[in-house]
Amino acid sequence: MPSLPGVNHQDAVRALEKAGFRVARQGKHVVMTDGSRVVTIPRHNPVNAITMGNIVRDAGLTNEEFRELL
């Protein structure tokens, strides 16, 4: 699985919003949902590449699809 290094958490939130996710709540992490899936994004920059890969997988996207949304 190719990694997604250096992704800013705000860019990740915007990309997931384009994919149909909405912010459910915020704190030290941003919790987003599309109605059936829930993903949690840490609010620190940059988000670790392995963590970002897991978030993308949990959102039901491929790394390539996510990169197109960035």
Features from the language model and the residues they span:
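Basic nucleic-acid-binding interfaces
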Residues: M1-L70
